[in-house]
Amino acid sequence: MNYMHLGRAGTGKTTQLIERVIDQLTEQPLGPSIYFIVPDQMSFEMERRIATDPRLSGLVRMEVMSLRRFAFHMIRDYGNQVIPFLDETGTQLLLRQVVEEAEEELKIFKRTKNMPGFYKGLDELIASFKRSLVNPDMLRQISGASPERSPKLNDLALIYERFTERISDKALHADDYFTTLIELLPKADLSDVSVFVDGFYEFSLQEQQVLLRLMELTKDMHLSFTLDVEDVYTKQSEFGVSQRCYMQLIEQMKERQIAHEDIYYGQTVKFQSTGLRMLEQALLSPGYPPTDEEVTGVTVSAAVNRQVETEAAVRKAIQLVRHDGYRFKDIAFLVRHLEPYADHLERAFQLYDIPYFLDQRESMVHHPIVELVHAVLEIVMTGYREESVFRLLKTELIPLPAEDPRLALDRLETFVLERGIKGSMWKKPWQLKRRLADEISLTDAELQEELELNEWRQFLVEAIEPLEKRFKASKTMSEYTRALYRFLEEHHMTDRLTVWKQQALEVNELSQAREHDQVYEAVLLLFEQLEAAAPEATLTTELFVQMVETGLESLRFSLVPPSLDQVIATDYVRGRLQQVKVVFLLGANDGLIPLVEDQSKLLSEGDHDFLHDQGIPVGKASLDVFDDELYYLYQGVTAPSESLHISYALVDEDGKALQPASIVKQIKHQLLQDRPVKTYFAEAGDHAPDDQLQFVTSPERAAAAAAIELRRLQRRYPIQPSWFDVYNRLLENGRGRERMALFSNALFYQNQAEPLPEDLARNLYGDTIKASVSRFETYNACSYKHFARYGLRLKERKLYKFEAPDIGNLFHGALNDLSMNIKASGKRWRELDDQSCSNLAKEAVEKVTPEIQNAILMSSNRFGYIKKKLTDVVEQTAKMLVKQAERSEFEPDLFEISFGNAMFPPLRFTLPDGTEIEFTGRIDRVDQATIGDQLYVRIVDYKSSAKELDFAEIYYGLAIQMLLYLKTVVEQSEVLFNQQAKPAGALYFHVKNPMMRGDLSADEIERNQLLLESYQMQGVIVENDEVLRAMDQIAYDERKKSPLVKVTFTKTGLHKSHTKGVVKEEELTALMDHAWDELKTSSQSMYAGDIAIDPFDYQERTPCTFCEYRSVCQFDQSLGNDYRQLNPLSEKEVLERLKEETE
C-alpha cells in the first residue's frame, strides 16, 4: 500500500515516519529490507537519529540513503555489467569535446563557447533535459514555433544528440542512473520491502518515474509532502512547488491505477513559542491579520554590515549555550545564498571559538598539486614563461636540488626576473655577465652562483622535457592522460603528499591532512573521467589542456559530516535541518530573499516560459519562481522549534546601501506591531548600556572590546562604568591580562622608530663611511628611509624592465662616450656640424645599448623602436650642445669624472667620535674658461627630466649635490687643471627632444632660437661680469635674454626679474660651505642613531610619494606619524639666512 503523509511544517510528518520505521524494526529486527530515502544532506542526521533511539539495538535491515545513492546501490547489485560513471566533471569535459567538434555546425553557441561557466551551464541544462524526460527530437519539433529561438534550440538539440551518442554504452551519465534504475527494479525482489521517502521539496519527472515504479513493486511506500491539508487538490496553492509535485504524482498514479491513502496532519506539534506558531500560518498568507499580542520566539534586527550582523548572531548563540542550557547542535545559521556570508561566518565561528559545520564544499583549485598540473600544462602549451615556471616550482612538489630549496628558488627567481629569461633561453646555458665597461673577471663566488643557477635550470628542463615529448607523440585522450599521469608518478606525488599529510597530523591539522588525502585521488579520478568520456578520441594538445583545466576548476573537497555538537551553517534551500531549536536567519535583504538569479546561464526567462508553454517543463516558468522562493523561505523559518532570529545588513562590503527584504516588513507588521528594530554596531560603546556587555564572551573578545572603550576614554568620550570592572577582572586573569596587554598595545600604538644605540649604528654603518652625496640627501629627506636603504640594506627585486633610471643611464653613457670621442679627435664642440653630431650620437648609443638593463633595448622590435627614439634625443641634444658651445667661452673639458679614488681623492672630514666620512661621486661634465689669467669652472649635470636648483632645498639639505660637486672641483682644481680655479656655477641640462609649438609662419632663425631656448640650463651662476659674458657672449654683447642660462642682460646690467640663480662670489661660497655643513650635520645625526620616521613636506611634495619602503615604515598619520613641514624660502631669504648664520 502507498501512503501520502500530508501536512504543514511542524505537524509531525517526519516523526511519524520515524516511528513507523522503529515499530517495524522492533517487531522484526531481521526482517525484509527497509529503505529510508532522504535528500543527501539529510541522510547522516536521519541515520544518527534512528540509530540512537534507545528502543533499537541495531539497524541490520534498514538503510538511510539519498535517491541517487539508492539508484547506485541497485545498479551495482542487479546490473549486468560495470559501466564507468561520468560525473559532473566528466560530463563537462565530454561536452567541451562535443562542442569543439561541432563548432562549424553551431549558430549561437559558436560565439559563446569560451565564455566562463559555459560548460557548467550546458551540463546543468542537459541534466535538466534528462530529469524532465526531454530528448533532442522534442527540442527540434518545437523550434519552429519560435523563429527567434530556433537557432539556439537547434544548437542545443545537436549538442544533446551528439553527447548522447558519444556516451551511449561507454559511460553512464549521472542523470541516466534513474533511467537504468527503472529498467533494473523488476529484477530485484522488492515485494516485501518498505520504502520511506521524506525531506524532499520536489521531484523531477524522472525521479517521479522511479517513485511510481517503486510503488508498483514494493510492499508499502510512505511519502511526505509539506502541504496545507485544507487545499490539497487546489491548483493554485500557497505551497507552490510541493503542491505541483504532489498533483503530478497523483495524476500519474491514477493513470497507472496505483492505489494510495492520504494521511493528513492538521495539528501543529513542533513549535514551542507563539511567534513561530503564528509565523508558520502568516508567512504564506499576506492577508493574515496583525496581532496585538506580545509574541515570543521571533525577533528582527539590523546591523551596520554583514560582518557585524554575523558576529551579533554568534554572540547571541554563545549566550544561549552558556546561560540558557542549549547545546551547539540545537542552533543553526541559515541564509538564502551562502556565498556573501560564508567568509563572515567562518571568521566569526573561529573568532569566538564555536564548533561549526559550514555546508560549503571548498574548491581544490589552490591546492599545490592542482597548481602543479595547471603550471606544467601552461609550460607545455606556451613555453617557459616566468609565471608558469615559478607557479610550478612554488608548489614545492618538485623542489630544486639544493640544501635549502626555498632559498634556491628565491635566487633562481631573482636571476630570471632580472635577466628577462623566458622560452628557449631556459634550454641554453646561462652566463653571469658584467657591464661591458667593467673588465673585472667573475669572482669565485660568482662562478659558483653561475654553476648552481645552471644546475637548477637543467633540473627543471629535464623534469618537463619528457612530458613535452610524450605530448608531441600523443593523439588520443588516453595517450595524453597517461602521459600526464606518468609525469606525476615520475615525480613521486603520492609520496610527497603522504609526507605532507603526516606532517599535518603531527600538528593536529586534521582538515589539512584530509585535503592532502582527497586531492590526489580527485586528480586521478579526473583522469579516469577523461578516459571514460572519450578514450580513443583524437584531439589536439590545446583541446586536451582546455579540458583538463576545465576539470581542475570543478574539483571540490568533500564535506566532513557534522560532529555531535556543532552549529550548522547552510542555505535553507539545500539544508535539511532536524531537531533544531534555534535558527538565526541572516541576510534578510532585498535581492537575497527572495534570491534574484538566472535559472540557467544559457536560457533566458523568456526561453523557460516558451518551453513550458510548449509542454517541456525544463527549469521553472517565471510565474512559479517567486512562489517557490517563498516556499523555500517557509521551510527555512519553520525549521526551529523554539526561536527564530531574523537579521539584515544596512550596507554591503562596498558600502552600498541595502534594503530589508519584504519578509522583514511583513513580520514586523503581522507579529511585532511595527516596532523599531534593534541595530547592531561594530563597537560595544555604540550600543545601549544594557547591550554593551554582550561583547564579553571570552577573555580575548572582552579584552578587544575593553581596549576599544579605553581608547574612547582617552579621546575624551564617556564610557560605561562597567568597562572598568571588565578591565579589572581581565587583569586578575592570566589569559585575560595577556590579551589585554596585546590589544592595548595595538590600540595605543604609536608608529615611532626609537633611536638606535650608537654602538649599533656604528656596527650598521661602519667606522668609515664612503658614500655619495645622494645618500646624505636621502637622510635629510627621511632618516628612516636612509636606515632602510643603507642600514638594513633593503632592496627591491630587480626586474627586466626599461624604466626612467635606465633612460638616464643611457643618456649619461651616450653623452659621455660622444664627448670623449670629440675630445680624443682634437676637435672643439663648436667645430662640429649636424651630420657629425648625428653620426657620433648613433655610435655612442650603439656602444652603450648592451650595457643598459641586460641589453633590453636589443630584445624585441618594440624596444628597438624605443631605442631609435632615444637615439633621436641624443642626436638633438648633441646638436644643441654644439649651438651652446658656439655662443659660450666655456668649453666642455672633463666628462664622467669620478672622485673618491687615488687619482681624484674624495673630500673627507672626521666626526668628534673619530668616524671618518668620505663622500664620493661622479660629475657628468666640467666646463672651463680662462678669463684673463684666472681659470673658472662650472659643472653641468645631465637630467632626463626637468630640474631646477631650488635654494630652499639647498638650505634644507635636500639638494646639496651640485654645490658639493662644485666645491670638490674647485678644491681639487690643482690636480685636475694644474692651477687654482674659481667657481663659475653649477647647472642642470635637460636631455630631451622637445616638441616645438608656436607660430608656423616663423622663419627658421626664430624656430632655431626657440629650440635653443628650450634647452636653457637652470642652476646657480656667479655674479661676475666677465663670467656672465663667458656664459653667453652673444646675449651679453646684444644685451638680450640668454637662451643658454637664466639671465637677461640690459644696457645697465642684469634684468633682475628675468634673472634667476645669479649670486655673488661670496654668496656662492656660502652656499657651498652650507652644503658641506649639512653633510657634517647629517653624518653626526646618522651615527647618533637617529632613524625617525620624519619625511619632509615641501610645497606638497614628499619623499613618500614614490618611496619603496612605505610598507616597511608603515607611515600613517593616524598612528602618530606626521610630515616635517618645510617652509618655502626665496633665493633672497636663503642668502640672508646664510649670511646671518656666518656672522
From Swiss-Prot:
GO annotation, biological process: double-strand break repair via homologous recombination
Keyword Nucleus assigned: no
Listed PROSITE patterns: UVRD_HELICASE_ATP_BIND (PS51198), UVRD_HELICASE_CTER (PS51217)
EC assignment: 3.1.-.-
Sequence positions that bind [4Fe-4S] cluster: 782, 1104, 1107, 1113
Subunit structure: Heterodimer of AddA and AddB.
Other facts noted in the record for this chain: Despite having conserved helicase domains, this subunit does not have helicase activity.
Protein name (record): ATP-dependent helicase/deoxyribonuclease subunit B
Naturally occurring in which organism (per UniProt): Exiguobacterium sibiricum (strain DSM 17290 / CCUG 55495 / CIP 109462 / JCM 13490 / 255-15)
Taxonomic lineage of the native organism: Bacteria, Bacillati, Bacillota, Bacilli, Bacillales
Gene from which this protein is expressed: addB
